[in-house]
Amino acid sequence: MTWQFFYWGPLLFHTTILPGHLKKLRSICRKDPKLDHRKSLAGIIQHEYTIELRDYLEIMVPYLSDFNQAAKEWYSFKKGADILVTSAWVNYMKAGEFNPPHIHTGCDFSSVLFLDIPEELKKENEAYIGTASGPGCIQFLSGEPSKYSIHQKTFFPNEGDFFMFPGSLRHLVYPFKSDIERISIAANYTVKAEPEPK
């Protein structure tokens, strides 16, 4: 007897950024009032700043190449997709700040990359007691809750975690209480690709 199951829903891609590349990414992030990006974002976060796209792309090429291969298989593209970074920004998240459930408009895919996860936040998450996923988690939501259907994926991120997903995939970031600063980079992309004929 043979059997199979079918992939369903959006592609949620994950990989880990190498330490050397994390160091380079940190070097292109800065708190510059002239680069304030908050007017374009949904987050309740005080410090969010634009990143130079050329610098970001130069570091991220190998990871976007891996995503390209995954997308080719998931979406049955004839060839790899042409991926263009349209915006990138750094988030300096502090106690009490959060990102409400939202999507990214004007793009095909989005990503989030975690640069620094302080130990205090890890301990706060481990100590959490409750039915949710706890402080500092990122959650992705697809569709509505229903029996025998997986509609959400939740992660407590580690340093170097990189997630890439359709811009239309709802996601949110839980707040935390620790007196620390967690740094992440988000980006949006447009994708041009030709699907395989059915």
Where are these regions (language model features)?
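PLP-dependent enzyme catalytic core of the Aspartate aminotransferase-like
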Residues: K198
